[in-house]
UniProtKB/Swiss-Prot annotation:
Oxidoreductase listed as a keyword: yes
Stored Pfam families: 2-Hacid_dh, 2-Hacid_dh_C, DUF3410
GO CC entries: cytosol
Family affiliation: Belongs to the D-isomer specific 2-hydroxyacid dehydrogenase family. PdxB subfamily.
Encoding gene per record: pdxB
Record EC number: 1.1.1.290
Name of this protein: Erythronate-4-phosphate dehydrogenase
Any one GO biological process: 'de novo' pyridoxal 5'-phosphate biosynthetic process
Record's keyword annotation contains Isomerase: no
Residues at the catalytic site: 208, 237, 254 (proton donor)
Annotated source species: Salmonella arizonae (strain ATCC BAA-731 / CDC346-86 / RSK2980)
Pathway: Cofactor biosynthesis; pyridoxine 5'-phosphate biosynthesis; pyridoxine 5'-phosphate from D-erythrose 4-phosphate: step 2/5
Amino acid sequence: MKILVDENMPYARELFSRLGEVKTVPGRPIPVEELNHADALMVRSVTKVNESLLSGTPIKFVGTATAGTDHVDEAWLKQEGIGFSAAPGCNAIAVVEYVFSALLMLAERDGFSLRDRTVGIVGVGNVGSRLQTRLEALGIRTLLCDPPRAARGDEGDFRTMDEVVEEADVLTFHTPLYKDGPYKTLHLVDETLIRRLKPGAILINACRGPVVDNAALLARLTAGQPISVVLDVWEGEPDLNVALLDAVDIGTSHIAGYTLEGKARGTTQVFEAYSAFIGREQHVALETLLPAPEFGRITLHGPLDQPTLKRLAHLVYDVRRDDAPLRKVAGIPGEFDKLRKNYLERREWSSLYVMCDDASAAALLQKLGFNAVHHPAR
């Protein structure tokens, strides 16, 4: 049995070699000749999986180590009897912490308290719901917009997009990409919506590039109307609009979900799915794969305020470390993908062990995902 895996999937060789012969390949483009001699294909979001890629090959199973699946033609796979699995929620925590890193940076730069801002979350799935929980733990007001969930009657106080645009100071998008249908998200953030953003608003897109009309956004930014923009995803990736990158506050190379933990979850989820598919079901404990974190222990004295949270969050991950490299190479062919391929190891807040002499600080940090304990001062 031969299994092709994307070369940027951590722990893939270690895990999938338990099931057969493993060959690592680049995700963009996949070497077609390798597909003719493989039984299974494990990819990331950079690989378009469809009839043109797989027709006539012996591939019997496709796994994507990603939460999103818009790069996979699931209907065609089903029609051909090819097994499929994604990794829903694998990088949700990573994306949430990316958003927090950006917001804490902007709050420090512009001198505002996050508790004084209302955050509109558009798309309340694995990422959006976790973001809501952490924001509300800090006492930050959230507005939720998720038309499909609202239509299903799911529990939650869902607002319309009009209400969110009208009331929110921050708009952060965490939707799938739907190019048509009743819940189309292609250019969900269009020229009309962009015009309606209040002065000083913050716009964050960490889901799919085409959710935001990049040309319309650039037009507003170059018109001198003050809004702050954080973009991790772009129309036309791996090519991007360099003028738009120059105009945004934070721009990164589609790496919001790129924590070591998130990548490892994605790999283990598709590994477990494939092992079940071939009748050799196995389960993997994530902690057995991950290395020790860079920082062993932090001691925190007193209550948790926003500047302290910012220091702790940025000790683990400061979004600016990914903004600067993209600006240096933007517009150079191949460099966008190279940044992703050679991405520096990044951990999640749970990797940071924080000893707190204040019980309320420990409790709040735990709600935010840190590995915090209360250790009274003596």
